[in-house]
Amino acid sequence: MSEDGAQTAEKMDTHTQYYLESLIIDALKGKGFQKIIELFDGKVIFSSQFHNKLLLSQLDKLINKELDRNEFKHVSVLMKCIQHFCKNDCQESSTLIHQGLVSKMVLWFERTVDFLRISKEATLLTLVEDFYDSALVICKCNCEDGKRQLLDSFLIRLGHLVTEKWVACHLRLEALRTINCILDSISREDKKKLHCSEDLCELTKDLARTIQEAGDYDIQVAISEALCRMMGKKFRDSFVHQWFEDNFLADAFKEIKDKEFETDCRKFLNCLNSRHQSNKGVYTFPCITVFTDLDELKKPQDENMENFWIDFNAGSQCVSFYIHNTEGSLWDSVRLLKESVNNYTLKENDGQQMLGIYLKDPQVINTNDVTKVKIYFEPKHDIKSAIKRVFEDINEIHSNPVELDSTEGLIDIGNSLASHTVITTATTFKQWKRNQANKMDSASDILGSQTSEHSSTTKTSSANRSVQKSLSNADSHEIVIESVPLEAVITIADEQPNTAQFQDDMDDAIFQGAASDVPAKDSSQEIIIITEASADKEFAAKKTQGIFQFQGYSDTLASDQVSDAKKKILLPKQSTERATPASRYRASMNSPLQRTSSAYRSHLFCESNEVTSNTESERSWIQDFKNKSAVKSADYSCEKTRNKSKRKVLPLASESGDDEKQVDTTETVARFTSRKEMHRPEDINPKSPHSAELKLPGISALLTPGDSRSQSKSDYRYQSAIDDQDIMDPVEEASSPEMSIDHNKEPKNGHDEVYASGPLNRSVDGNNIYHAADTLQHATGKRKHKTCEREEIPFKPRKLFSSTEKNVNRSAADSEDSEDVFYSESHDQDLAEASVLSAFDSFTKELKRKFLTRYKRIENRANHVLKSSHQQVSTVLNEIHQCRLQKINHFNKIVVHELSSLEAEVQALKQFEKETLDFWEDQYVKMNTFCSSQTQRIKTMDSALLETISNLKNVIQKTTKEEVSNTEEHIQNKLLK
């Protein structure tokens, strides 16, 4: 390759690795989410994705922006992007976590919960579930800091969500399962510190109170498990009296043993529910037996499980019970929700109460599609009150659902048979049992011959299409009936119905008519075409004869019964899951992140190292994604014990990190041998263009659901080989044989691969043709894992990977693109390489163990120092706070006292001012009076003075005149002398 070509390839590879981040930036700029949605829908395939340090801030802005716009679907897509980054590479996830991903998630989750208070949109419910998935992805990353952050912040928020009564039941249950998964993933040291957290102690009290108010048995079990995980046995005994004020309940909770959690928890919850008669939320009764259609269900096989318990949950409005799983050691759960029930009957016969529940759509129970469940109780139990509390709005049928008016087998389903009639042969269940073998052979031959003719019609039919809808099509001259057995259907113009006496229970008449000639499960299936009646008169005459009239029984129920037989006989096997937008249980064929139903809980302590198959039943909702080890971590579920002597009790909460499973050399050799056998040249088309495509690892595992029950034996072999690998590794996933085979096998009918969000089924004939299941699963439907899925290898940091192991993985990926090189390797070379890999694997794990031991010592020392510093700082801050409070209180008292003194002085001054004004007013009056009198006096004195002066003048003048005269006389006298 030239230098320019190498540079161009390097640029293209860099662009591909950062493609998802570029789409997020484009969405932030307002260019939409369509390309990201197509990426996660599987329409675009790319290699491993990376990001820069600015991604978290960009995601924060974009998520808050979309939440402000109420675009919850876009936020779900962004959460899937976060899951992919965390799942794709441990280094990438550590970068996001160290930047504060968990704290951002808590803020986003709180905003989402606030929206959930005022809206119940399906996209909003899905977003809440995506937060659960993101938390699980972080748990599976090999980042202890992320787990610790989840434990400190996100787990508390989930616990508060569980205690809220307004939250939907399935969201609360999924939140509890997420809490238990988080608690199961943390180390033993972190578990020992849980009882020291005040927030967690308060949360345990709230959860214990919620147990008594939940109204659903599964929620009660999940809360009990969470309490047992949060508090060890010795701390549990000290906290239990704070959780339960009733000493009887507290003592009953103490009796729960970790190794017998399921049965002991059943005893405790039965005791708790029986003591709340006034406000009872869960009614629990032992039943005699349970039947689904014609099959009997068995109680879980446990020597401590004495009765077959049926729970009537008033809070979640469902009937639930656990049954024995015939193909695994786990328990299967059956939940009959109110929304999926059409009606029910309750009657007493032969000293037994029979509760019949009729479903709207078929539900998968023990790998069978079921539309009717019959539960038998002893007459002493008050079943009527319990069922009315659960199905309060559903009418009870007091008469038989099906009444036989004559000996004919004519079925009238409402008004949908206005111009068409279906006649079934009158046969009893015993007759069917005697003739089953002969009829099965003939039916298989006929159906097999018709499969090729009507294959296109079969593919377009859906599992939930009712007979009533098919019969009401007046434009067609042919009726496509997919639910009536082949030998039970005849044309009206050719044959008259036979007469027979039905000896069985009238409640089973519908199922005998619809399934009287049920062929074997693996036999060929096809559609039967019945021609229209040629004469209306003949039809009217025959209609008046023996008719099954559905009195008090809805037309929908009748069509559902026939639809049940339809999927049993004439349709290819459809997916057993019905997904709803609000459902938590969206199944993914390769996803390691699923939380399966609590019914399939593993035992708290795994008592067997046996690898059980989970082909047609759901896996335990507590998933251990680490390698199987001799010592397993605590796992709260009950395991079927076929041989008690082989059971082994292991200690609680053993840390899987210190006890990694040692990979056996022979197992490694077998893996390489099986891989080479599966990669034979004749099985792979080397010219297929799909081999050169880039694939985004982890996306198909998360978002491409599937059902593994219909896989052939060859699929099982190469699937087992793939499951031994770490599916989270991009190199191994890109070179998996399953991916190569799926890309290179072309369907016989030439159809392209169908991308669908719903469950997909692989056809029985081996071709990679997927039929989208139309049947919607209810909100509490179960998540299912693929067949014989092995426990996955935990995520490892890149630094702990052996360089030789990385080179082997890269060479395996390169060999997928160039098949000739891969297939040229000899069997001896594979064995030698397997031995080298095994040796390096042992060396790597020993080195990892030493590193982890040293790291944990350093971490414990650092944690101790940090804890001491934190306590000292907290003490100082507390003292400062108390001092500030004292100063503020003292200052407040002084100010109040001074204000009161000032107010008193102001009042005194006002009084003094008033007195002064009054005094001066009096003085002013007196002064004016005095002045007036003085003025008058002065005037009087003036007049007197003037008079005196005038008198004085007169006197002076007289005197003067006399003196002058005397003087003159004297002078004259002297002169005379």
From Swiss-Prot:
Ubiquitinated and gradually degraded by the proteasome during oocyte maturation. The keyword Nucleus applies. GO terms for biological process: meiotic nuclear division. Residues 674-693 have a biased composition (Basic and acidic residues). Residues 449-462 have a biased composition (Low complexity). Keywords: Centromere, Chromosome, Nucleus, Phosphoprotein, Ubl conjugation. Residues 463-474 have a biased composition (Polar residues). Oocyte-specific protein that localizes to centromeres at the dictyate stage and regulates the survival of primordial oocytes. This is Synaptonemal complex protein 2-like. It comes from Xenopus laevis (African clawed frog). The gene is sycp2l.
